[in-house]
Amino acid sequence: MDKQWQTITGKQVGDSYFQVQHPSGLTILLYPKENSSTTYAILGTRYGSIDNRFQRSDEPAPEEVPEGIAHYLEHKLFESEDGDAFDRFSKTGASANAFTSFETTCYLFSCTDALYQSLEILLDFVQAPYFTEETVQKEQGIIGQEIKMYDDDPQWRVMFNYLKAMYHSHPIREDIAGTVESIAKITPDLLYRCYNTFYNLGNMVLALAGNFDTEKVLEVCDRMLKPAGSVTVNRVFLPEPNEIVEPYVEKGLSVVLPMFQFGFKEPDADKPRSERDVAAMEVLLETLASDASPLFRQLMDRDLINESSFSYEYFEGSGFATVMFSGESKDPHAVAEAILKEAERYRREGIPKEAFERSKRALYGEIVSALNSTASIANGLVNMHLKGRELFTYIDSMADLTLEDVTRQLEKVFQKERSVLSVVLPLQ
């Protein structure tokens, strides 16, 4: 079979990997690491919980399906007429898993030997859906229990209450697993419909990192991959205003200390963000709130946060983007106020150059050291590819960042009128 090969080399790190466009439509990313004892493989599709409204290129109108189908489909794909895929992996000694996020569904394994056999299993079961009325109904009970369990999970609730207070219509505000009501509407026909739309190999990517023979990997792919049709699929979102829904939301649950999530809604989030944009925001967050920052020390000195729970993240994807700070605090309002004040000080006085340089070096070092892990490499390749980005471009962007890049992100995103505080309080 004819394949298009491309060697991609990082300007900063000097490492290389191969990108192969397979005739079946699948993009294959191969990152050899000869000294590695484990190989990690991950097969991902650009299909997550936010994809409940979509438009196929071969159909005239968009379609809407019940929430929770992507997650449901991931659960069901492990089952086939021949049994469970986990049982098949256990025979090769591979450790397998799968996950559904807001934007992607991924199936993965790691192994120390029997790689090609394990790869066959992965490519086989993901391309062989098997849904019946009986198995679909059985799964509804299992996932229904999972949904109810998350309803009382404080970390889950503080996050989704935050997203609901921030987003008016974007499906990021809905639980990944759906609701008990939405999954009751799922049928075998709907599962096949979504499978055939999103598990088209042209919408998917396979990445391997570790010690392997590239030719043998491609032989397995040639044998196992079923050619995709030329259908493309686009996400369809309702218009999302730049304004938030409400600035404060709280809920009582069984916690000892109040938990909080505080952050800012990025405007015009439907516009694409480059590798450089993402790197700039990550460096800004590190400069503002890392354990080396004045803000962190002040919050610790005032006993407003604890080191083990405080964290921050740039959470962004198709049609959404937000900067989030979370943790436990006796006074979440005081934490939010301190973050706002420090962002305002940065805007007024400028971001300290030394702190910016230190943060950039720290993050760059973390990213480069992650290239020693086959899991980090393969996950990074897939995650970047499914977002329309490239791993080495991101690393090179991090190294090339300027203070101006970071200041632009500060001015654009850290605005009080677009901030939300979500709190989970102890039950009275």
Description of each model-found segment:
Residues 2-9, 205-208, 346, 359-428:
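C-terminal regions of mature proteins
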Residues 261-268, 287-329:
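A structural supersecondary motif
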Residues 323-352:
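Extended amphipathic alpha-helical segments enriched in small hydrophobics
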Residues 232-238, 307, 311, 349-359:
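Flexible, glycine/charged-enriched surface loops at secondary-structure junctions
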Residues 81-194, 306, 338-341, 351-379:
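Acidic/histidine-enriched segments that form metal/cofactor-coordinating
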Residues 1-84, 192-298, 420-428:
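His/Glu-rich zincin catalytic helix
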Residues 59, 74-76, 106-110, 130, ...:
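Second-shell loop/turn segments in exported
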